[in-house]
């Protein structure tokens, strides 16, 4: 049945999936950014591209490394949604 609780549950699960998929990439980018910032502070180098390039390479590397897992998680969530939709619609309007 398409109730407000069911819709909120689906939204909550979707947000959780997004956080679960994005967290490893963002955490590694954060760590690399902090390391580069500390390096810049210690050496007094204020080059803007020095912060951008390592973070971009780290993000691309993490996506390449975890891309298969991310795709599997998204596929499982999508299949679960497609399985639930007929049950929600079948009961009719509230």
From Swiss-Prot:
The keyword Transmembrane applies. Keywords: Bacterial flagellum, Cell membrane, Membrane, Transmembrane, Transmembrane helix. It comes from the Bacteria. GO terms for biological process: bacterial-type flagellum assembly; protein secretion. The chain crosses the membrane at residues 19-39, 50-70. It is a multi-pass membrane protein. InterPro entries: Bac_export_3, FliQ. It is found in: Cell membrane; Bacterial flagellum basal body. GO terms for cellular component: bacterial-type flagellum basal body; plasma membrane. Its main location: membrane. Belongs to the FliQ/MopD/SpaQ family. PANTHER family: FLAGELLAR BIOSYNTHETIC PROTEIN FLIQ. Role in flagellar biosynthesis. This is Flagellar biosynthetic protein FliQ. It comes from Treponema pallidum (strain Nichols). The gene is fliQ.
């Amino acid at each position: 049945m398409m109730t407000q609780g069911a819709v909120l549950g689906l939204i909550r699960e979707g947000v959780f999936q997004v956080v679960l998929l994005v967290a490893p990439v963002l955490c590694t980018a954060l760590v690399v950014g902090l390391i580069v910032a500390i390096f810049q502070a210690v050496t007094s180098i204020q080059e803007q591209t020095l912060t951008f390039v390592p973070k971009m390479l780290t993000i691309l590397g993490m996506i390449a490394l975890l891309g298969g897992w991310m795709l599997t998680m998204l596929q499982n969530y999508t299949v679960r949604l497609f399985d639930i939709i007929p049950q929600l619609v079948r009961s009719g309007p509230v």
